[in-house]
């Protein structure tokens, strides 16, 4: 039943495909190839104008995996250093080095990905305004056409909270963000989307910056809430949007992988809700 419902729900052509995060590139090249082959076989991507993969941690990226992404049509990836300060990377448990980040960016740009994003986080443990400035200034030399500047969000159950790691003050986070704005503008970047999360340091925000023409459509679709988003996988949240009637509904997949696998009836129910919603839109 789930497969039949899936086929009924994915007849519409996809405008933007996004596979994220987490870090999909923890999969092997063979696993990634099998997964993207299934995506291309089951979805109509003939009108797809954006194919984005979260490459995530630089220590999960190699030439073979990136070639698989290119072979399947990926035109946008994200490499997420978060920081280039060794003591910050150590404090947050990251295994990669600043040199790994530079090598990953060199590889991605040399292989010809049209768009590459880098994620940075202001307010990480052990960071300082000076360290954040060094990180941003260096990242601006790597050739990314998108840079997303996040503010640390202290999520419940996070290692930072559980271990009581000291974090920069709100004043220091403000100094980091105050530096980012003119530094990015000077290099031709402009902000194009903004959002807030709960428990953010200093009650600041996350801002996506890009070079003109390099905007990420999926990011815009999420922020505008004018487009339906069909989500697949454990923890996924499907958003159904009927802009004409000013109506939005959401359905959620089971969060944990084992629960997701053991509850196919929930997946069938969610897909039926998606199908019924779009039938009503067409009336």
Mark where each language-model region is.
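Single conserved hydrophobic/aromatic residue that forms the stacking wall/gate
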Residues: 2-10
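Bacterial c-di-GMP phosphodiesterase catalytic domain signature
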Residues: 83-94, 144
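Radical SAM enzyme core and accessory elements
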Residues: 1, 208-283
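Short, electropositive alpha-helical surface patch
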Residues: 29-38, 66, 70-74, 128-143, ...
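Conserved C-terminal portion of the radical SAM core fold
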Residues: 72-78, 83, 99-163, 170-198, ...
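Canonical radical SAM enzyme core domain
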Residues: 3-4, 24-68, 81-84, 96-100, ...
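Short glycine-enriched, charge-decorated loop/helix-capping segments at active-site entrances
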Residues: 90-96, 163-167
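Glycine-rich beta-strand-to-loop/alpha-helix junction loops that act as flexible
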Residues: 17-24, 150
């Amino acid at each position: 039943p789930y497969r039949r419902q899936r086929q009924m729900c994915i007849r519409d052509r996809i405008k933007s495909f996004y596979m994220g995060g987490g870090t999909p590139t923890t999969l092997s090249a063979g696993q990634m190839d099998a997964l993207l082959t299934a995506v291309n076989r089951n979805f109509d991507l003939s009108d797809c104008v954006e194919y984005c993969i979260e490459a995530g941690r630089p220590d999960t990226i190699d030439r073979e995996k990136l070639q698989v992404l290119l072979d399947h049509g990926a035109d946008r990836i994200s490499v997420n250093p978060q920081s280039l300060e060794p003591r910050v990377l150590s404090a947050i448990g990251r295994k990669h080095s600043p040199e790994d980040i530079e090598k990953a960016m060199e590889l991605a740009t040399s292989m010809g990905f049209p768009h590459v994003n880098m994620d940075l986080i202001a307010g990480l443990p052990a960071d300082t305004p000076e360290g954040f400035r060094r990180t941003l200034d260096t990242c601006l030399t790597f050739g990314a056409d998108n840079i997303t500047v996040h503010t640390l969000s202290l999520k419940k159950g996070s290692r930072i909270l559980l271990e009581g790691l000291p974090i920069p003050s709100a004043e220091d986070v403000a100094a980091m963000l105050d530096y980012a704005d003119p530094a990015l503008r000077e290099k031709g970047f402009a902000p194009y989307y903004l959002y807030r999360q709960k428990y953010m340091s200093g009650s600041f925000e996350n801002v996506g910056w890009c070079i003109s023409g390099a905007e990420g459509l999926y990011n815009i679709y999420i922020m505008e809430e004018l487009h339906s988003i069909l989500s697949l996988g454990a923890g996924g949240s499907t958003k159904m949007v009927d802009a004409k009637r000013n109506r939005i509904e959401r359905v959620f997949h089971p969060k944990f992988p084992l629960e997701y696998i053991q509850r196919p009836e929930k997946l069938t129910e969610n897909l039926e809700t998606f199908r019924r919603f779009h039938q009503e839109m067409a009336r």
